């Protein structure tokens, strides 16, 4: 029965806190986010430092990433996609690297006074912040293009749908945040449980599966963000 005690002892998402201005912040989330941003910046700098007409090495990878993100934005946003490609690309890269960091970086080897390090996206505060930022962005996109006429979409095609259309603006960030948080947290929890039971062999395929699903989650989030922006920009 000892293995049952091992499973019950598995914890994901423990926190240590920093106090700033009377507010309690999850310190490890900030540390992990800075590490992720540092990795993204380092990748961008090293792969674009010596650009050549015929790309090779890291420049090939950088151009592939840029073209991939641009295609997502073009497909989802439409005619005005170039203006919103940087935002969609930033979301995609931050979520993608955050998710992969949880699977590839041995965070547990770094000891903290309290809590543990892990992927920023396994914290609900991170995913909610990303979802709210997405909501604010598509509101801004609609208001920038249409002005106050943007709010006319809430009574289209009939004013009876006003409550449903308003409710939709609340469900979008909820679905974005909980989908990402739930998938990443569940993946880390399953791997942690299996590692406690069979430390070497069985968890390895699940780690590769986690890498795949982590990439898919980043793609889904970025695609939906682009779709929401495109919806805000299109005519009634």
Curated annotation (Swiss-Prot):
This is ATP synthase subunit a, chloroplastic. It is found in: Plastid, Chloroplast thylakoid membrane. Its main location: plastid. One of its GO terms (cellular component) is plasma membrane. The keyword Ion transport applies. One of its GO terms (molecular function) is proton-transporting ATP synthase activity, rotational mechanism. Keywords: ATP synthesis, CF(0), Chloroplast, Hydrogen ion transport, Ion transport, Membrane, Plastid, Thylakoid, Transmembrane, Transmembrane helix, Transport. Belongs to the ATPase A chain family. HAMAP family: ATP_synth_a_bact (MF_01393). It holds the Pfam family ATP-synt_A. F-type ATPases have 2 components, CF(1) - the catalytic core - and CF(0) - the membrane proton channel. CF(1) has five subunits: alpha(3), beta(3), gamma(1), delta(1), epsilon(1). CF(0) has four main subunits: a, b, b' and c. The chain crosses the membrane at residues 25-45, 87-107, 123-143, 180-202, 210-230. Coiled coil: none annotated.
């Amino acid at each position: 029965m000892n293995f049952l005690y091992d499973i019950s002892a598995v914890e994901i998402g423990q926190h240590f806190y920093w106090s700033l201005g009377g507010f309690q912040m999850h310190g490890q989330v900030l540390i992990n986010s800075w590490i992720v941003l540092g990795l993204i910046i380092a990748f961008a700098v090293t792969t674009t430092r010596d650009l050549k007409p015929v790309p090779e090495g890291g420049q090939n990878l950088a151009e592939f990433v840029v073209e991939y993100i641009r295609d997502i934005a073009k497909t989802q946003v439409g005619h005005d996609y170039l203006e919103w490609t940087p935002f969609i690309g930033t979301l995609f890269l931050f979520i993608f690297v955050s998710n992969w960091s949880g699977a590839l970086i041995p965070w547990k080897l770094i000891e903290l006074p309290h809590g543990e390090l892990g992927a920023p996206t396994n914290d609900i505060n991170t995913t909610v912040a990303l979802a709210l930022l997405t909501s604010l962005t598509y509101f801004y996109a609609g208001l920038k293009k249409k002005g106050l006429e943007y709010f006319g979409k809430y009574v289209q095609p009939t004013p009876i749908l006003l409550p449903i259309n308003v409710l939709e603006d609340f469900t979008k960030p909820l679905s974005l945040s909980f989908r990402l948080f739930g998938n990443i947290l569940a993946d880390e929890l399953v791997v942690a449980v299996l590692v406690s039971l069979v430390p070497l062999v069985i968890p390895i395929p699940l780690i590769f599966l986690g890498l795949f699903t982590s990439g898919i989650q980043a793609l889904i989030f970025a695609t939906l963000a682009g779709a929401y922006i495109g919806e805000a920009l299109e005519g009634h």
